[in-house]
């Protein structure tokens, strides 16, 4: 276990203002080989159609907390998964304590002193807390069986050291999300790793629990650990991080001491470009209020969301991961019914508890995860496109007007420029962009008045994105009211008449198009 504490800031850092407009990579501040517990050099990683990391570099010094900042899709999580052995890089190298290593999976990374606390908790719900922490490392008695007394004892000792008040014999499934998070942290600490990666560790914690976590982090820092801390919360950066690095669009932008910058400096580094004209939007007349939402909420998820949506309007919804954006869409469409608040359509109160009820009121919902909740991957285009209309105008006397439905699906496929051998091609064989077009076509066949789009261009190429943007703008021009949720700031700013911003389950503001820019939206999204 290390005992040395390395002093804060790195002399010779570039000024934050100079980095704010940078589009390339600048070298991390100089530090000796003995100082670095972890270093990444020129690492790149691509997925089909997407460059997630483009030759990035990154260093973590002993006895420091190094925050990683960037918008959704900046490459932070991909880099951390490479460091933790989950992904294999396409290029570049990783050095641990100055020595190049090849990580052959997460267990290999653990053996080399790198532990990661994932945002998505990875505990076994039907095992006890102690069994989860020491899985694969259980103490054995002289007969080679698990020594349960020793297991409880060493868990209790670990918890005492970390001031965690949880019974080691409790089944994980009975714990709150916050308690599970503390168990995950304790498990990572139990490996006595040199590097701990924490991905949004406070997302489920109360203020009191955050204070407790920060006390643990400071304790680990004093022991000489290198801690990588991924967060969207700027106040946490200034409270706990010694230094931070910013990533943008898969590129490394720069590293600075936390004490040398302001909140606005960081936002400018994360934003880095003027994009307001990248998505030209047609000016169309805005009509009457179609959808009115007042104090909408789902217990424990989001609360007090209020807004109006007019015919021909595109209302963008921005916010960081976990802000509640998608949950609002699910409540509106009856996937997870609202537990409080009121929904009105054309001024009349409606109760929506199922997607079928939402569809009867003229609503359509394109979900954010096309593979898990959108596409029927082993079915063909026709089956996927007709899925939402089989109880609609194509059914008469309990018979489906199959010929008419097929003609309309063919016409929709042509209009959306879906590239495929034909309607009987399995949708899993199509590109992401063409899959998305099929799903949009599915909902357009229902002739919706209110169209909810959750991440409409996620994971598709630039050309397909442009086509979908043109389509959404054209639908608004025909009077469709569009609610568009997106993690891509250029898309939100370029396509929206107004932008609603959410943070941690509550609405923090609605900004008119003329007043919206990335700095203002990011400020509202991190309040």
From Swiss-Prot:
Domain ABC transporter: 38-274, 284-523
Cellular component annotations (GO), alphabetically ordered: plasma membrane
Entries under Gene3D superfamilies matching the protein: P-loop containing nucleotide triphosphate hydrolases (3.40.50.300)
Reactions the enzyme catalyzes: D-ribose(out) + ATP + H2O = D-ribose(in) + ADP + phosphate + H(+); D-galactose(out) + ATP + H2O = D-galactose(in) + ADP + phosphate + H(+)
EC number: 7.5.2.11, 7.5.2.7
Keyword annotations: ATP-binding, Cell inner membrane, Cell membrane, Membrane, Nucleotide-binding, Repeat, Sugar transport, Translocase, Transport
Keyword tRNA processing: no
Compartments where located: Cell inner membrane
Entry's Gene Ontology molecular function annotations: ABC-type D-ribose transporter activity; ATP binding; ATP hydrolysis activity
Residues the record lists as binding ATP: 70-77
Keyword match Heme: no
Membrane topology: Peripheral membrane protein
Entries under SUPFAM superfamilies matching the protein: P-loop containing nucleoside triphosphate hydrolases
Biased composition (Low complexity): 12-31
Sequence segments annotated as region (Disordered): 1-31
EC class name: translocase
Family: Belongs to the ABC transporter superfamily. Carbohydrate importer 2 (CUT2) (TC 3.A.1.2) family.
Primary role: Part of an ABC transporter complex involved in carbohydrate import. Could be involved in ribose, galactose and/or methyl galactoside import. Responsible for energy coupling to the transport system.
Protein name per Swiss-Prot or TrEMBL: Putative ribose/galactose/methyl galactoside import ATP-binding protein 2
The organism of origin for this protein: Burkholderia lata (strain ATCC 17760 / DSM 23089 / LMG 22485 / NCIMB 9086 / R18194 / 383)
Taxonomic placement: Bacteria, Pseudomonadati, Pseudomonadota, Betaproteobacteria, Burkholderiales
């Amino acid at each position: 276990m290390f005992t040395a504490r390395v002093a804060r800031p790195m002399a010779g850092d570039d000024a934050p203002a100079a980095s704010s407009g940078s589009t390339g990579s600048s070298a991390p501040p100089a530090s000796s080989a003995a100082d670095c517990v972890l270093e990444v050099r020129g690492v790149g990683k691509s997925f089909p159609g997407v460059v997630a990391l483009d030759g990035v570099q990154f260093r973590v010094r002993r006895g420091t907390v190094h925050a990683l900042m960037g918008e959704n899709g900046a490459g932070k999580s991909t880099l951390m998964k490479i460091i933790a052995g989950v992904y294999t890089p396409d290029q570049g190298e990783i050095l641990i304590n100055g020595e190049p290593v090849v990580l052959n999976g997460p267990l290999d990374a653990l053996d080399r002193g790198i532990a990661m606390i994932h945002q998505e908790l990875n505990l076994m719900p039907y095992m006890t807390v102690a069994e989860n922490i020491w899985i694969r490392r259980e103490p054995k008695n002289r007969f080679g069986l698990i020594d349960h007394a020793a297991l409880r004892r060493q868990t209790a000792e670990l918890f005492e050291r970390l001031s965690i008040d949880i019974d080691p014999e409790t089944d994980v499934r009975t714990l709150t999300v916050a308690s599970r998070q503390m168990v995950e942290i304790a498990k990572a600490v139990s490996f006595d790793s040199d590097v701990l990666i924490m991905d949004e560790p406070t997302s489920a914690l109360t203020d009191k629990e955050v204070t407790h976590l920060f006390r643990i982090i400071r304790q680990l820092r004093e022991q000489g650990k290198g801690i990588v801390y991924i967060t969207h919360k700027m106040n946490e950066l200034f409270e706990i991080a010694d230094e931070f690095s910013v990533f943008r669009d898969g590129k490394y932008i720069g590293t600075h001491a936390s004490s040398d910058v302001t909140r606005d400096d960081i936002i400018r580094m994360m934003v880095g470009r003027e994009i307001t004209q990248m998505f030209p939007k047609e000016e169309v007349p805005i009509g009457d209020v179609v959808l009115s939402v007042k104090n909408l909420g789902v217990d424990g998820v989001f609360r007090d969301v209020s807004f109006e949506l007019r015919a021909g309007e595109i209302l963008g919804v921005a916010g960081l991961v976990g802000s509640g954006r998608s949950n609002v869409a699910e409540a509106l469409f009856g996937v997870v019914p609202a537990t409080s608040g009121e929904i009105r359509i054309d001024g009349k109160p409606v109760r929506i508890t199922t997607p079928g009820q939402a569809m009867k009121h003229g609503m359509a919902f394109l979900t954010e995860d096309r593979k898990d909740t959108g596409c029927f991957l082993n079915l063909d285009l026709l089956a996927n496109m007709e899925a939402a209309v089989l109880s609609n105008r194509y059914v008469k006397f309990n018979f489906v007007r199959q010929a008419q439905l097929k003609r309309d699906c063919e016409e929709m496929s042509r209009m959306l420029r879906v590239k495929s051998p034909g309607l009987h091609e399995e949708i899993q064989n199509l590109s992401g962009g063409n899959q998305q077009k099929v799903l949009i076509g599915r909902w357009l066949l229902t002739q919706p008045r209110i169209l909810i789009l959750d991440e409409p261009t996620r994971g598709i190429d630039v050309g397909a994105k442009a086509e979908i943007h043109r389509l959404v703008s054209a639908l608004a021009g025909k009077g469709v009211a569009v609610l568009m949720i997106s993690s891509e700031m250029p898309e939100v700013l370029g396509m929206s008449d107004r932008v609603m911003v959410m943070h941690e389950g509550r609405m923090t503001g609605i900004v008119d198009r003329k007043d919206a820019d990335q700095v203002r939206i990011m400020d509202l999204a991190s309040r």
